[in-house]
Amino acid sequence: MNKGHVIQVMGPVVDVKFDNGQLPAIYNSLTVKIERPNEEPTILALEVALHLGDDSVRTIAMSSTDGLQRGAEVTDSGKAISVPVGEVTLGRVFNVLGEVIDLGEEIPADARRDSIHREAPTFEELSTTVEILETGIKVVDLLAPYIKGGKIGLFGGAGVGKTVLIQELINNIAQEHSGISVFAGVGERTREGNDLFFEMSDSGVIKQTAMVFGQMNEPPGARMRVALTGLTMAEYFRDEQGADVLLFIDNIFRFTQAGSEVSALLGRMPSAVGYQPTLATEMGKLQERITSTNKGSVTSIQAIYVPADDYTDPAPATTFAHLDATTNLERKLSEMGIYPAVDPLASTSRALSPEIVGAEHYAVATGVQRTIQRYRELQDIIAILGMDELSDEDKQTVERARRIQFFLSQNFHVAEQFTGQKGSYVPVKETVRSFKEILDGKWDHLPEDAFRLVGSIDEVVEKAKSMGVEV
């Protein structure tokens, strides 16, 4: 065993000297025992980041360095961090090192383990077909449909509903498509991860899901690598079992943020807005592994926190370049009580073309966007002069647009305990039919309130009847 000793500790960054001159490879995992008074000794994992010269390496700690002292003995494992993969991971909760943290039984010692650092699939292995993934969420399926094996970004500031949307997607995919999901909690609230685990256990969805957490309270090393741990588990199901896997990452911004926290300590010059100079490379290494191959697919849905709602910030801007579809959450819509608060004009998808979704779907989607765009253009006039100054055609457009805007909202299954309303899953065909009828003016006589937080157009009619309206 190759052994060295700690020569410097700077928070989450630890320098180690190997006197025999045998330096461990970059990304190798090292271990060191931390002994604290009146406590059980703990094993700290370190990952090699830099060779410094003078027989020393600079490493990033995967857990707290409290109690670590200079001179402590360090052992080189001879390989990168490896985590369990396969059926043993389903229904379990792991940390960045692949250790179970759900108080259940340990993973068997003979279970297969894969390195978290792997090459992306080669060009020849990539799939070339485009297939739509039905989510049951109207605004997504109609205006920014998701692609199987694609990368989808959920953009939004703090508290506009990114995590709730992810939970609903996990629920819908598990219930309607019985697919395998991997959830990577990267630098988010521990309480949310805890709630998610118990909610998924109650609904039975957990049996089809592996969960990996490196939350806000953990050092940046864990937050930097936990997305790779989740991705490695997802890749096994794709490559060895030919499955279509969903990888949820909440939140990809925290992955970048963790990288920037250790970047300066590693001795790198900061780049724009203080981010690490290797931002694009780190993001590319992660994103290029998320793809469809000729064996199976990994579809990733990534929540992306937008600092101060500024979309030009380098972290969200770098992520944009990798995405096939974006779902933009808008604070103004959540303030109006429209949930999910998805902006129908800012959200985009590569799949929204007549060749992929079909001519009727494309025509209805563009009709909806055109109507909402016209309504937004008229809002200034309405604010200054009032509705009476509009032409009859514009009045009709405004009334229809308001109905469409309310109809883009719906109740979620995962929010039933808060709203008291039953969640709805709306198939794509039903969504297209419903919006086509609204655009054609078939339901102009129904009150706007009937369109709020419902599923299909048939539910709107039922709601209008319950309000005492002649249908």
Swiss-Prot record:
PROSITE patterns documented for this protein: ATPASE_ALPHA_BETA
Positions in coiled-coil regions: none
Stored Pfam families: ATP-synt_ab (PF00006), ATP-synt_ab_N (PF02874), ATP-synt_VA_C (PF22919)
EC nos: 7.1.2.2
Keywords per UniProt: ATP synthesis, ATP-binding, Cell membrane, CF(1), Hydrogen ion transport, Ion transport, Membrane, Nucleotide-binding, Translocase, Transport
NCBIfam families from the UniProt entry: atpD (TIGR01039)
Alphabetized HAMAP family for the sequence: ATP_synth_beta_bact (MF_01347)
Protein name (Swiss-Prot/TrEMBL): ATP synthase subunit beta
Gene that this sequence comes from: atpD
